[in-house]
Amino acid sequence: MGYLVKLFKLVVWMLVIGLFSIPSLVSYVIFYDTVIPHSVIQYPVYFNYTTGLNFPTAEVRLDHFSIDPRLPGTSLLQIKMPHSPRNSAMGNFMVSVDFQDRNQRSLKQVKRTVLLPHRSPIHEYLKLIVCSPLYFMGILEETDIVNVRLFESETFAKSFNSITTLSVRFSVKNTPAQAIVKIYSKDIEFYEATLAFASKLHGMRWFMYTHKVSAFLVFTSLFWFTGITSTIITYLIVSSTSETKATRR
């Protein structure tokens, strides 16, 4: 008989643990989705070479901008360029990006000087000899990828209107809606360009994003313990109230 009582208690405890584990998991998912923004988002940049323009210009629609504009972030313009004599002889050139809101008002303007990485002729010849089989097979390409750092640890917004709990799409007054990208050179040759944004996480956000398993165990246990404690306290209060009423009767 004692064995059955112990087994019954074990089953009850397992049911309690199971019942409180589901809300704990759901709570952590909601908490993670609310606290952690999308870390990186990229947009392709398509430049316009229409006759009459002095330099290549692109209008990038920042649809579904899921980076929290209140958090410090980094923005990069990545340009994939062929390692051609024309690009090598071009020297320095300027890049500008104008971030605008939905009403086409400028939020932030950035201008940067860009220079292709220099390589000596000896370095180029040695690389061509060593990597020639990979070039013939199409595994390697004679390209240069230039990363133009537009800004770092800066924010678009200082105040916000509302945040939706189950989404990382923020209704923020100064959220960028588009970016006007200009390259002040008609001599440049490139394959493609990408505008990228990345959130810079600190403190708890950094811990939750970089240590996902540990954060999951810690916060899920915390939510589970909170649920169990609240239930026990509520049960004790209700039981004591019921006993008091029964005694008065």
UniProtKB/Swiss-Prot annotation:
GO biological process: lipid droplet formation; lipid droplet organization; lipid metabolic process; lipid storage
Transmembrane residue ranges: 11-31, 213-233
GO cellular component, one term: endoplasmic reticulum
Location(s), subcellular: Endoplasmic reticulum membrane
Lumenal side of membrane: 32-212
Coiled coil: none
Keyword Iron-sulfur belongs to the record: no
Alphabetical UniProt keywords: Endoplasmic reticulum, Lipid metabolism, Membrane, Transmembrane, Transmembrane helix
InterPro entries: Seipin
Membrane topology reported for the UniProt record: Multi-pass membrane protein
Family the entry assigns: Belongs to the seipin family.
Function in brief: Involved in lipid metabolism and lipid droplet (LD) morphology, number, and size. Facilitates initiation of LD formation, and ensures that vectorial budding of LDs from the ER is directed towards the cytoplasm.
Annotated protein name in UniProt: Seipin homolog
Species whose genome carries this gene: Schizosaccharomyces pombe (strain 972 / ATCC 24843) (Fission yeast)
